[in-house]
């Protein structure tokens, strides 16, 4: 998926403009104070430099001509100079302190915006982007903005103010020497622009390569057991070396160009200083221009102040270019198009009055209905949530040009248990993903209690579904917190009841801290079966009318499977259930079994009916070949 600003925002100047606008929008007062402090700091530096002329011509030179020198005027002048520089130091401290706060605050806001937008992205986005690369945006890319905001931006602003004010002062002192200085600064700016353009594309590559390294490390950490089982440590290391070497090359290319910018400009600045000293010395000695010693010394100081900002800007170029590469990736994530949701039907709590009419209520009644805001009258506004699910001629493909489900037709009445069986890749899990609207179909309709699910708000649709995914995901926190994740307002007693229903209560109580046992690393301190039981308990506490069990017992041992199955049978009672299992014994009691092959339903019926037909289901169940 491409974001709406992908092409436009690759321009570094537009990225910088957007970032500056973002900072000013959120920190108007702080930015104003920073500009004032930088302005005062730059002017105090300039005043100090110009004061040197008066110090030499009006105080030091007259002292050399006095028989009895009076140093008190000189001392007073020096005190004024110290006061000027003290104000500059305080202002420098002030704007640096403020910019640190602005930088950290901006990074916090951007991380929050990225995370908020990321949570609204469709599942398809995460299918096509490496998780480690996304993590790199939150860490490496966002960190490139820290130095830009807290150091580079104020430094560049300070340098620009110094450059302009110094230029005006130089013109006042001596125009010929100013021309020499301007020519040398123009050369410095030309060199800086060429070198920064050359290094810019390498910094973009560097940030991408950092993301690839992070993605590979994250993948290897998740698959470390598989790596060790197949003894592929050396192969993994070699592959990492290739990715890491590519990062080294892009970083080396970027930094070797950026790092020579400052030395080159520094030497050009020194040449400018020497030329001004030579030309100024000749003019002063000839008496042609009326240059005094104080004016020449002051101008040479101004020359340093004129070339130094360009050198300082060139020093910040690498940080700015790298930050723009990072900012591009940050704004790319912020600009990713969220999951579309055009539904308007809501899931609401209801109660019945004495006349048997439905009324919406804020109380938790455990009775739910679909609310249609555009209904013609009140009788049609509410549809009781029952769990009736129908597929009518559904076609779907993860890519529009490659359909993986063909003309799927089925219905599940409230309380029925439907099972999907078939070989790997037949499309079983895909069907459950469509019920959740993790993906939208290409053709056909899916109806929930007679309502097209495209008309139901996605959040409300998903709240009505309980899900046990193929991969059990647990979060850092206590066991109680993980069970309560199914319904955040559930009480401890309700969570414990759900655990008992899932037959998880027994092993939980045997843990040292029981329900307060802290899980870390996705529940790595629990067995696979225990994690599966907690996932089932989490679905149970949500108390949904429809359950989706994707390979719920495919990864646990036979003994635990029997334990889970008893809990699941109790949980599925009275609920519409969609079950996917490779172990066909777990779905024998299903009301209807759908046999899938290459995205089509090729057989359907009860276990006994399908066994009598001796078709594909019979082959899967018995392991026997179908006789011709």
Task: Outline where the language-model segments fall.
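Membrane-integrated ABC transporters
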Residues: 1-45, 60-79, 95-99, 103, ...
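Juxtamembrane helix-loop junctions of ABC transporter transmembrane domains
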Residues: 6-12, 36, 44-60, 84-131, ...
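Alpha-helical segments in transporter systems
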Residues: 29-54, 77, 81, 95-100, ...
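Helix-loop-helix
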Residues: 62, 169-183, 253, 257-328, ...
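ABC-type nucleotide-binding domain
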Residues: 67-68, 350-628
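An intracellular "coupling" helix at the cytosolic face of ABC transporter transmembrane type-1 domains
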Residues: 25-28, 123-124, 142-149, 153, ...
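Transmembrane helices of ABC transporter permease
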Residues: 26, 30-40, 84, 90, ...
């Amino acid at each position: 998926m491409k974001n709406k600003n992908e092409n436009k925002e690759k321009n570094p100047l537009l990225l910088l403009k957007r970032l500056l606008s973002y900072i000013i929008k959120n920190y108007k007062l702080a930015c104003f104070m920073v500009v004032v402090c930088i302005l005062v700091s730059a002017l105090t530096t300039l005043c100090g430099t110009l004061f040197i002329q008066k110090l030499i011509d009006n105080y030091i030179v007259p002292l050399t001509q006095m028989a009895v020198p009076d140093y008190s005027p000189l001392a007073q002048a020096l005190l004024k100079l110290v006061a000027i520089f003290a104000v500059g130091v305080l202002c420098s401290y002030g704007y640096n302190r403020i910019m640190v706060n602005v930088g950290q605050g901006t990074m916090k806001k951007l991380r929050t915006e990225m995370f908020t937008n990321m949570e609204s992205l469709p599942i398809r986005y995460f299918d096509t982007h490496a998780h480690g690369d996304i993590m790199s945006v939150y860490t490496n890319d966002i960190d490139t903005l820290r130095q830009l905001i807290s150091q580079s931006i104020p430094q560049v602003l300070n340098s620009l103010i110094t450059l302009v004010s110094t230029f005006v002062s130089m013109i006042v002192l001596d125009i010929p020497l100013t021309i020499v200085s301007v020519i040398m600064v123009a050369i410095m700016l030309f060199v800086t622009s060429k070198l920064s353009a050359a290094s810019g594309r390498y910094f973009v590559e560097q940030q991408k390569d950092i993301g690839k390294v992070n993605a590979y490390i994250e993948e290897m950490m998740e698959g470390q057991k598989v790596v060790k089982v197949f003894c592929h440590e050396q192969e993994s290391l070699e592959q990492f070396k290739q990715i890491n070497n590519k990062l080294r090359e892009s970083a080396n290319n970027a930094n070797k160009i950026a790092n020579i910018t400052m030395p080159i400009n520094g030497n050009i600045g020194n040449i400018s200083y020497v030329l001004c000293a030579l030309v100024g010395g000749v003019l002063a000695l000839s008496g042609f221009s009326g240059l005094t010693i104080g004016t020449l010394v002051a101008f040479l100081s101004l020359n340093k102040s004129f070339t130094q900002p360009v050198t300082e800007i060139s020093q910040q170029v690498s940080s700015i270019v790298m930050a723009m590469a990072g900012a591009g990736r940050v704004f790319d994530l912020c600009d990713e198009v969220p999951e579309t949701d055009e539904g308007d039907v809501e899931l609401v709590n209801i109660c019945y009055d004495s006349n048997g009419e439905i009324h919406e209520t804020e109380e938790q009644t455990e009775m739910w209905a679909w609310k249609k805001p555009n209904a013609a009258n009140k009788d049609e506004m509410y549809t009781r949530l029952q769990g009736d699910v129908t597929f009518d001629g559904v076609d779907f493909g993860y890519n529009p040009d490659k359909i993986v489900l063909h003309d799927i037709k089925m219905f599940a009445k409230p309380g029925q248990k439907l099972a999907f069986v078939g070989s790997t890749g037949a499309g079983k899990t895909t069907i459950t993903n469509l019920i959740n609207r993790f993906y939208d179909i290409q053709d056909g309709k899916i109806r929930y209690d007679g309502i097209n699910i495209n008309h139901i708000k996605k959040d409300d649709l998903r709240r009505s579904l309980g899900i046990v995914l193929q991969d059990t995901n647990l979060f850092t926190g206590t066991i109680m917190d993980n069970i309560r994740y199914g319904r955040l307002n559930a009480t401890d007693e309700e969570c414990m009841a759900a655990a008992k229903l899932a037959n998880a209560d027994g092993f939980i109580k045997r843990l040292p801290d029981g329900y307060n046992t802290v899980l870390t690393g996705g529940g790595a301190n629990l067995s696979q079966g225990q994690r599966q039981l907690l996932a089932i308990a989490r679905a149970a506490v949500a108390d949904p009318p429809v359950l989706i069990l994707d390979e719920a017992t495919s990864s646990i041992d036979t003994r635990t499977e029997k334990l889970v199955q008893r809990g699941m049978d109790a949980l599925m009672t009275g609920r519409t259930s969609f079950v996917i299992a490779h172990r066909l014994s777990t779905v024998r009691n299903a009301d209807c079994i759908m046999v899938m092959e290459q995205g089509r339903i090729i057989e359907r019926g009860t276990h006994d009916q399908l066994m009598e037909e001796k078709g594909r289901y019979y082959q899967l169940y018995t392991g026997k070949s179908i006789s011709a």
